[in-house]
Amino acid sequence: IFAAYAFITQVFIIMISGLNVFKPYVVNSFLLAMGTFIVLALLYLVLTVLVAKFVTTKTAPKWMLSIGVVLILATVTGNIFALLLGISLIQKTRTKDASAIEKWQKLWQKILRNTMALHGLFFIVFMFSLSVVSSWTFDYDFATKNNYAELLQSPSLEYPLGTDDYGRDLFSRIVFGAQISLIVGFFATIIPGVVGGVLGAISGYYGKRTDNIIMRLLDVLYAIPGILL
């Protein structure tokens, strides 16, 4: 099912990115990116058939190991389903411990049985992938530069969601806004994790006194209202 959803996600990316052909011009990387997306979509479609034919719940042919590596590399486009499929194939071709594979299968079976959870996961992966590849297929100028000749345009093929009162393409603004939100969210998650890990390592290494000092400093920090921070 990962292969099928990787294919569907890629098709949606191609459809959304393809709307840029109706604009006056496209970015230099547009044709190369779209060609790559089409190749990946065909790969996922072929894999959907191959996985259904050759892969069982616990095993996969040895020759699928290289395909798993390619799928992991393809995750650079943000298609998390490709990553999950790649991990699953590598695990089934290399792992001899059936219990480890069963744990992985049970984890995803619980999610896949829940239709709403699966649809939510698809939407998240789609938005993530679109945010990742938007720099290759969308022109940033349409989202930021004022175009007074195109003020408040109604939705059309050229401007799927119309333009604002400065003539900027609302569709492009939403796509790049999602990209910025993704970057901010990523660093907002990573930085506290790194800082917390470093402080935890220091307190564990130097012992109780250092741990108490760090905890009291953090208590002072937590006492400050978040809006001031």
Predicted stretch roles:
Residues 41-44, 170-205:
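Transmembrane alpha-helix signature in integral membrane proteins
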Residues 28-42:
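Alpha-helical transmembrane segments of polytopic membrane proteins
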Residues 66-88:
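Hydrophobic, aromatic-rich membrane-embedded alpha-helical segments
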Residues 1-10, 38-52, 68-71, 82, ...:
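N-terminal signal-anchor/first transmembrane alpha helix
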Residues 12-26, 51-56:
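Juxtamembrane "helix-exit" motif on the non-cytosolic side of transmembrane helices
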Residues 24-27, 107-110, 144-186:
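Periplasmic/extracellular loop-to-transmembrane helix junction in inner-membrane transport proteins
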Residues 54-58, 133-137, 187-218:
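Transmembrane-helix boundary motif in ABC transporter permease subunits
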Residues 93, 214-229:
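Generic hydrophobic transmembrane alpha-helix motif, especially the helices
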